[in-house]
UniProtKB/Swiss-Prot annotation:
This is Periplasmic nitrate reductase. Its main location: periplasm. The keyword Nucleus does not apply. Belongs to the prokaryotic molybdopterin-containing oxidoreductase family. NasA/NapA/NarB subfamily. The keyword Methyltransferase does not apply. CDD domains: MopB_CT_Nitrate-R-NapA-like (cd02791), MopB_Nitrate-R-NapA-like (cd02754). InterPro entries: Asp_de-COase-like_dom_sf, CT_Nitrate-R-NapA-like, MoPterin_dinucl-bd_dom, Mopterin_OxRdtase, Mopterin_OxRdtase_4Fe-4S_dom, MopterinOxRdtase_cofactor_BS, Periplasm_NO3_reductase_lsu, Prok_molybdopt-oxidoreductase. Binds 1 [4Fe-4S] cluster. Binds 1 molybdenum-bis(molybdopterin guanine dinucleotide) (Mo-bis-MGD) cofactor per subunit. Catalytic subunit of the periplasmic nitrate reductase complex NapAB. Receives electrons from NapB and catalyzes the reduction of nitrate to nitrite. It is found in: Periplasm. It comes from Pseudomonas aeruginosa (strain LESB58). It is an enzyme of class 1 (oxidoreductase). Component of the periplasmic nitrate reductase NapAB complex composed of NapA and NapB. Substrate binds at residue 797.
Length: 834
């Protein structure tokens, strides 16, 4: 058998993915032929549906179904490679329990909160939704309605939802599930640089000498990027890899400097590195003097718990968490001076020689460094601080905004950047880094959206965790979720999430593809189209915006989230949802539907259906009579063009494998803030952090503070949650792929063998994991990929039959409002020895 190099690479990649899923050799080799003229397949590009890496795949369709996918060899991100999840993308839409009709809880032919789900029409679904929304708005105003969205929304779905709630219904109670994963990264960027999102790109991987992973298991969570890191490490002898985590995982296999630290002490390690840089004379004085100023952040800021919690009452600055005062470099140096090597080794548990070697990676002026982090940093009661502290290190050394020198926050969802952050679907944000609390920002949005001045409320809406609390307390009464599964993914679900959803005064709508845990707890389920059943756009972790066409039809009566949002807007007139004083400013809008005002406004509807590329279906174009995706995108792009968030024209993205913003004069930007790469940086300045008026970044003096909950005599173990390679988030897609489910069918309790021995457990024992909030049953694993130190257990959250978030604590970072899923106290109880 003679294979070309390309054929061998494709066969090898397929074999690796199949082996990971436990497939036999014959099946592995059965679909290596991909040529369209041989197979009668039609191939098109699309970004992968899973993580924030943003891999591009080629999607094969035949007879109205997706039948195969493979890595896109033209894609800069993944270069033809996929991870094991990506290789099974063709199966995620075809689970046997796919939702295809709206379902309402009913008894005796009417809605009943305690009734059974029965199929209804879309007309009936929108009837009861409109009834519930209008009743709540009339009785209690905009604060009584809300929406929980997603970093998996397409760009235009998130944008339409943002408009509908913030301008149409005048409620800022819209927040994405990205609050649980990226909010601390957002606030870290905003505080340090005055603008959100990374300054670097994936090209840094091939340009650097050092990789430092902080709370990031890239080998399993970003495996395609990890393949590039591995290639760089193995092909260049000077390259070093440091990995820091609270437990050992697969990324440690490549580590030159492996470090397992005690939970929360990453703050101490970060301050020690800054101190080492200063004490050893490694500060890049010229860079710091020209480009950095210093500030002391508020301390003792609480833990984002309910106001009556003792920890919140005790905190001195819970209401001033995001404040700071200016200091100088000398004061900053004095602040970090107590974070010595000896103290850091003692309190973190990391050997001193490894800590010093890590600090010297950063301090060495001849060595380039890329710092990667994900949920270990962000899901942290001091996650914003952790982000600020890593920026301190890169700013002190000047190792930033240039090839191979980059602090890089990796995202977990395919459009947490593109939709949640850039579109501004958080409860405090508007597109392009604008915020609802700023009058000028509201004015900008109102002008672009062509709504009267004063339409957008200045009060920040309820964030994700607060939404659950407000549902429970009866403040929030009508709640719509799309592309999210918060009943499984939210923290402390039994005490703070489920009670609000089942509160008889509340009405909860879930739009989803499968009957998830959240869907089963709802009152109304709306069947959604997914991935290539609709035209879409995602924005990945390196600011790359990627488009795809609709390639197949959704099954049954399933509809895209965009169609649901826009069609539902027809059910409201301005008279029903806007006060008289607002309508008096724009009498021409009186009596019009929100659909007319928001989506038939002369901007969104200005592109005719004929603009759609030939040969592609588009159900929303058919439904509304114009190219709504193009209209929404171009209106949204107006927020950022000329302001450092420039997006290319709509049609350019269908031709490219994504473009990294800002895109100016057709050219994408790889490194922001650096002259020669970023068009917004003035000639001769070298570097400009133009998010702030003085074009300087801020280095923050921030201390170590303890976690909200720690092990004690009654609950002697730390619990950390997270993911595994084969599953994505709550498993609602991957658990329906037989090969992935077979590979990892159950969530396990990973623990140290000595802890198991002392508790008289063994591998396979069934145990209870118990906290002050709830408990689950699962089996013990003392071997395998995750190796916790003594005193810590790790349980992934993909398993709908083992809801580990019954156990977790709903403490959040007080600045970002992001949940800490990595640190709470539990005990382990034997149920069955096995």
């Amino acid at each position: 058998m003679n294979l070309t190099r390309r054929e061998f690479a494709k066969a090898n990649a397929a074999a690796i993915a199949a082996a990971a899923a436990g497939l036999p050799i014959l099946v592995r080799a059965s679909n290596l032929v991909t040529e369209a003229d041989v197979t009668s397949l039609v191939w098109n590009k699309a970004p992968c549906r899973f993580c924030g890496t943003g891999c591009s795949v080629m999607v094969a369709t035949r007879d109205g179904q997706v039948v195969a996918t493979h890595g896109d060899i033209k894609a800069e991100v993944n270069r033809g490679i996929n991870c094991v999840k990506g290789y099974f993308l063709s199966k995620i839409m075809y689970g046997s329990d796919r939702l295809t009709r709206p379902l309402l809880r009913m008894k005796d032919g009417k809605f009943d909160k305690q009734g059974e789900f029965q199929p209804i029409s879309w007309e009936q679904a929108f009837d009861i939704m409109a009834e519930k929304f209008k009743a709540a708005l009339k009785a209690k105003g905009p604060e009584s309605v809300g929406m929980f969205g997603s970093g998996q929304w397409t760009v235009w779905e998130g944008y339409a939802a943002n408009k509908l709630f913030k301008a149409g219904l005048r409620s800022n109670n819209i927040d994405p599930n990205a609050r649980h994963c990226m909010a601390s990264a957002v606030m870290g960027f905003m505080r340090s640089f005055g603008m959100d999102e990374p300054m670097g790109c994936y090209d840094d991987i091939e340009a650097t000498d050092s990789f430092v992973l902080w709370g990031s298991n890239m080998a399993e969570m970003h495996p395609v990027l990890w393949s590039r890191v591995t290639d760089r490490r193995l092909s260049a002898p000077q390259v070093k890899v440091a990995v820091l985590s609270t437990f050992e995982h697969r990324s440690f296999e490549l580590a030159d400097l492996p470090m397992v630290f005690k939970p929360q002490t990453d703050l101490i390690i970060l301050n020690y590195i800054a101190n080492h840089i200063i004490e050893s004379g490694a500060v890049n004085r010229d860079f710091v003097e020209r480009h950095v100023r210093f500030a002391h952040g508020a301390e003792d800021i609480g833990y984002g718990l309910r106001p009556d919690d003792p920890l919140e009452k005790k905190a001195k600055n819970a209401d001033k968490a995001n404040t700071w005062s200016d200091i100088d470099f000398k004061a900053f140096a004095e602040f970090v001076k107590p974070y010595t090597l000896e103290r850091t080794a003692r309190e973190s548990g990391v050997p001193a020689e490894r800590l010093k070697a890590l600090a010297e990676l950063y301090a060495d002026p001849k060595r380039k460094v890329v710092s990667f982090w994900t949920m270990g940093f962000n899901q942290h009661t001091r996650g914003v601080w952790a982000n600020n502290l890593i920026y301190n290190i890169h700013l002190l050394t000047g190792k930033i905004s240039e090839p191979g020198n980059s602090p890089f926050s990796l995202t977990g969802q395919p459009s947490a950047c593109g939709t949640a952050r850039e579109v501004g679907t958080f409860s405090h944000r508007l597109p392009a880094d604008l915020v609802v609390t700023n009058p000028k920002h509201r004015e900008t949005a109102e002008k672009i959206w062509k709504v009267p001045a004063g339409t957008i409320q200045e009060k920040v809406g309820f964030h994700a965790v607060q939404q659950s609390r407000m549902l429970k307390d009866g403040v929030l009464n009508v709640y719509w979720t799309q592309v999210s599964n918060n009943m499984q993914a939210g923290p402390n679900v039994m005490q703070e999430v489920l009670p609000g959803w089942r509160n008889p005064d509340n009405f909860v709508i879930v739009s989803d593809v499968y009957p998830t845990v959240s869907a089963q707890a709802a009152d109304l389920i709306l069947p959604s189209a997914m991935w290539v059943e609709k035209e879409g756009a995602f924005g990945n972790a390196e600011r790359r915006t990627q488009f795809w066409h609709q390639l197949v039809k959704a099954p049954g009566e399933a509809k895209s989230d965009l169609w649901q949002l826009v069609e539902f807007s027809k059910r409201f007139t301005t008279d029903e949802v806007w006060p008289a004083e607002l309508l008096a400013k724009a009498p021409e809008l009186k009596g019009k539907t929100l659909y007319d005002v928001l989506f038939r406004n002369g901007q969104v509807d200005r592109f005719p259906a004929s603009d759609l590329a030939k040969g592609y279906a588009n159900d929303e174009v058919d439904a509304f009579g114009f190219y709504i995706q193009k209209g929404l995108f171009e209106e949204y792009a107006a927020f950022g063009r000329g302001h450092g968030h420039d997006l290319a024209p709509f049609d350019a993205y269908h031709e490219a494998r994504g473009l990294r913003w800002p895109v100016v004069d057709g050219k994408e930007t790889r490194w922001r803030y650096r002259e020669g790469y970023d068009p917004y940086v003035s000639k001769g300045s070298g570097v400009q952090f133009y998010g702030y008026p003085d074009k300087k970044a801020i280095a923050f003096a921030l201390p170590y503070e303890p976690p909200a909950e720690a092990p004690d005599q009654d609950y002697p173990f730390w619990l950390a949650t997270g993911r595994v390679l084969e599953h994505w988030h709550t498993g609602s897609m991957t658990a329906r792929v037989p090969e992935l489910y077979k590979a990892v069918p159950d969530a396990l309790v990973y623990m140290h063998p000595e802890d198991a021995r002392q508790l008289k457990l063994r591998r396979g024992s069934e145990v209870k994991v118990v906290s002050r909030r709830g408990e689950i049953r699962a089996r013990v694993e003392t071997r395998g990929r995750n190796k916790p130190p003594q005193g810590l257990v790790f349980v992934p959250f993909f398993d709908a039959n083992k809801l580990i978030n019954k156990v977790t604590l709903d403490a959040t970072d007080p600045i970002s409002k992001q949940t800490d899923y990595k640190k709470c106290a539990v005990r382990i109880e034997l149920l069955n020895l096995a």
